[in-house]
Amino acid sequence: MAGQKIRVKLKAFDHRLIDQSTYEIVATAKRTGATVSGPIPLPTKKEIYTVLRSPHVNKKSREQFELKTHKRLIDILDTNEDTVEALMKLQLPAGVSVDIKS
């Protein structure tokens, strides 16, 4: 298990939650003696939805909504069993999606 690389991808709609989560992951990994590369901010995906304001007429009157997905990438190098165990016990906010690949 020693010397293995772990890649952590985070996704969230709120940039404050994702920044807080990346800080916690980096601090936990450094505390256990692993080398951390990142967090690397990946491009933000922006989805725009346009809907009619009225249910029947007035095609010219529309409203736009947007949904931004923020992403971060963290590479954890030189891991050991303590690092993996500490990352598994880490409690992150509910609005953050975490993908871990080794």
Curated annotation (Swiss-Prot):
Superkingdom of this protein's organism: Bacteria
Looking up SMART domains in the UniProt record yields: Ribosomal_S10 (SM01403)
Q: Which GO terms describe its biological process?
A: translation
Question: Which PROSITE patterns does the record associate with it?
Answer: RIBOSOMAL_S10
Its cellular-component GO annotations read: ribonucleoprotein complex; ribosome
- List membrane-spanning regions: none
Q: Which Pfam families match?
A: Ribosomal_S10
Gene Ontology terms, MF aspect: structural constituent of ribosome; tRNA binding
| Keyword annotations of the record | Ribonucleoprotein, Ribosomal protein
Q: Which InterPro entries match?
A: Ribosomal_uS10, Ribosomal_uS10_CS, Ribosomal_uS10_dom, Ribosomal_uS10_dom_sf
Which cysteines form disulfides? none
Similarity comment text for this entry: Belongs to the universal ribosomal protein uS10 family.
Quaternary context: Part of the 30S ribosomal subunit.
The job of this chain, per UniProt, is described as: Involved in the binding of tRNA to the ribosomes.
UniProt-recorded name of the protein: Small ribosomal subunit protein uS10
Source organism: Leptospira borgpetersenii serovar Hardjo-bovis (strain JB197)
Output the lineage of the source organism.
Bacteria, Pseudomonadati, Spirochaetota, Spirochaetia, Leptospirales
